[in-house]
Amino acid sequence: MQSIVPLHGFGGVPYSAVRKAAPKNLLDNSDFTNLVAQAGIGGNHGTTAYAADRWILDSGTVSYEAGVGLTLNGTIRQKLEFPPTGDTSTFVGMASGEASISYADGAVTITSSGGVLKWAALYAGVYTDATMPDYHPKGYGAELAECQRYYVWFDRYLSNGLLTSSATNYYMPISLPVAMRCQPTATSSGWIGRISTGYSKYTGSTKKAFNSLWISDFNGCRLSVCDSISTATDANNINVSFMVYDLEFCADIL
């Protein structure tokens, strides 16, 4: 393999200088022209309003056009799981219009009256116009994986579960796309249905709303969703297939 840069000691530069890493952008979902919004722009994660993943909508409204940016009339905020440890940090962003930016207590806050946000970055340490690194989007896939540490939404999920305790509870294992920050809370405005019997085991309906969700057996990338089923007529401890619609897991830092 041909070396592009001559090795140190042969008239070249030190290898360590070539390999010096660019500073890490500490913000998640920082490219406002290609946003991750699993619950939709301005949607709720649980009971909390979000402009998009990781960006809490503290006040006002937002709208979005892919490739253009996020129009903000209000305030959004991102709380960092691992804030910078030094005394000084540098925030940089790009917007069409005006926006005010602040950083305190491990959170970045952006306020604007109609400005269109393009991107944002937070770096540990002090940078000037001359030393500030160029902004490079991480890419949608990388941003989605980072965001799913804090929030995961399933439009639908098929799983083999267990109906037990006199057919009043079910346990449904779910594999998460990434390890979540902590044991999440599970919420849903959707429903669950039996696959193997065409949902016929649920009295008076082909589908059933969730009753009282809880989580068990959480190990980072896997958990079991549990709920009570008062209308099922199955025997104890049988394996069944469930289809779940509109199920979310929240583990963000508020």
What spans do the regions from the language model cover?
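Extracellular and organelle-lumenal recognition/adhesion modules and their flexible linkers in secreted
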Residues: 4-254
